Swiss-Prot record:
Its EC number is 5.4.3.8. It holds the Pfam family Aminotran_3. One of its GO terms (biological process) is protoporphyrinogen IX biosynthetic process. The keyword Isomerase applies. It catalyses: (S)-4-amino-5-oxopentanoate = 5-aminolevulinate. This is Glutamate-1-semialdehyde 2,1-aminomutase. Homodimer. It is an enzyme of class 5 (isomerase). Its main location: cytoplasm. InterPro entries: 4pyrrol_synth_GluAld_NH2Trfase (IPR004639), Aminotrans_3 (IPR005814), Aminotrans_3_PPA_site (IPR049704), PyrdxlP-dep_Trfase (IPR015424), PyrdxlP-dep_Trfase_major (IPR015421), PyrdxlP-dep_Trfase_small (IPR015422). It is found in: Cytoplasm.
Length: 426
């Protein structure tokens, strides 16, 4: 047995499923998950000593690559001053100033510890601000594991074949309306059915938890218009897309102005950080200035703030997002070319530093049903054969891939060459 197999066997006796987040268990592809010893640049190194070109990037945060010296040094320097204070720090102010400067729609920002905390808190704030209870989310989108959001959830719940998670009371779920991503008619129908009851829409601007599905040109502006028409707030969940699709996020890339924005992943530089923010009048409703309660023992943790501040300063450097886009486009085009040579039907969606691989005869993948019609079994074989080639993709047909600026042209070419060999075996 490999060391990963031994560790996984031991882990399953101690940790549910052997992992601390379900998708890591390889449930969506089968087999034994890799146990990682270290990472550097574009590469992961497992406990058995094998190196992999990494397109998971810790599920999104590692836009600069692993073990970036600026982030590492910032963490070391901050740790020397103490690990946690439970009191305000100067770095929290600097971080808030940086985030609100980079994302102009955020007049104010509140730091939390995860993307789930960010979305959960933003929805509570929207409900408190509007005095309404119902929310709209979209089938196949994932916004964390809060009860009100695990209703026809995407991501791991798709892989597990559970459109609704057990443990979510029906009384919670009844306030969550699930519409069809990229279908404005379904959203209008929800508003017309409950014109005075919907507090907010929460949406991934690029659906990254049913692989990678970009919005149709009219979709996000249409959501903005519907929120304005019916007096609801628009929450854009940029936990995945923030600072990756564009410096100011997918909202800037697609030209839509939300009332609230949720951030995570890149904002922490690899540390556990989330944030939510937006219009000043809405944020003023948050405790302690307003009646909507939210708190966190480790929110604004000095180590996490130092990591995030260093990361965002690097991400804001000129050329970063152009490089991300160029590398991702090169990979997508190379995979399509290699698949065509092998007569393998393939669609590759990509936006900025995100991409999605779909085995399908369809010309495009735009809707939830398009994703669900893809050949998951072929993806499983593709995943394992690529892993043997030293390429680590997301271990699920329903998760996006992530590029970093640490990936080189050689890494991209080696990945395409590996895919060419794998396609010949499928």
């Amino acid at each position: 047995m490999s060391k990963s197999e031994n560790l996984y066997s031991a882990a399953r006796e101690l940790i549910p499923g052997g992992v601390n987040s379900p998708v890591r268990a390889f449930t969506g592809v089968g087999g034994t998950p890799l146990f990682i010893e270290k990472a550097d640049g574009a590469y992961l190194y497992d406990v058995d000593g094998k190196a992999y070109i990494d397109y998971v990037g810790s599920w999104g945060p590692m836009v600069l690559g692993h073990n970036h010296p600026a982030i590492r040094n910032a963490v070391i320097e901050a740790a020397e001053r103490g690990l946690s204070f439970g009191a305000p720090t100067e770095m929290e102010v600097k971080m808030a100033e940086l985030v609100t400067n980079l994302v102009p729609t955020m007049d104010m920002v509140r730091m939390v510890n995860s993307g789930t905390e960010a979305t959960m808190s933003a929805i509570r704030l929207a409900r408190g601000f509007t005095g309404r209870d119902k929310i709209i989310k979209f089938e196949g989108c994932y916004h964390g594991h809060a009860d009100c959001l695990l209703v026809k959830a995407g991501s791991g719940a798709l892989t597990l074949g559970q459109p609704n998670s057990p443990g979510v009371p029906a009384d919670f779920a009844k306030h969550t309306l699930t519409c069809t991503y990229n279908d404005l008619a379904s959203v209008r129908a929800a508003f017309e059915q409950y014109p005075q009851e919907i507090a907010c829409i929460i949406v991934e601007p690029v659906a990254g938890n049913m692989n990678c599905v970009p919005p149709l040109p009219e979709f996000l502006p249409g959501l903005r218009a519907l929120c304005d028409e019916f007096g609801a707030l628009l929450i854009i969940d940029e936990v995945m897309t923030g600072f990756r699709v564009a410096l100011a996020g997918a909202q800037d890339y697609y030209g839509v102005v939300p009332d609230l924005t949720c951030l995570g992943k890149i904002i922490g530089g690899g540390m556990p950080v989330g944030a939510f923010g937006g219009r000043r009048d809405v944020m003023d409703a948050l405790a302690p200035t307003g009646p909507v309660y939210q708190a966190g023992t480790l929110s604004g943790n000095p180590i996490a703030m130092a990591a995030g501040f260093a990361c965002l300063n690097e991400v804001a450097q000129p050329g970063i997002h152009e490089t991300l886009d160029e590398l991702t486009t090169r990979l997508a085009e190379g995979l399509l070319e290699a698949a065509e040579e092998a007569n393998i039907p393939l669609v590759v969606n990509h936006v900025g530093g995100m991409f999605g691989i779909f085995f399908t005869d369809a010309e495009s993948v735009t809707y939830y049903q398009d994703v669900m019609a893809c050949d998951v079994e072929r993806f499983k074989r593709f995943f394992h054969l690529m892993l043997e080639e030293g390429v680590y993709l997301a271990p699920s047909a329903f998760e996006a891939g992530f590029m970093s600026v640490a990936h080189s042209e050689e890494d991209i070419n080696n990945t395409i060459d590996a895919a060419r060999r794998v396609f010949a075996k499928l």
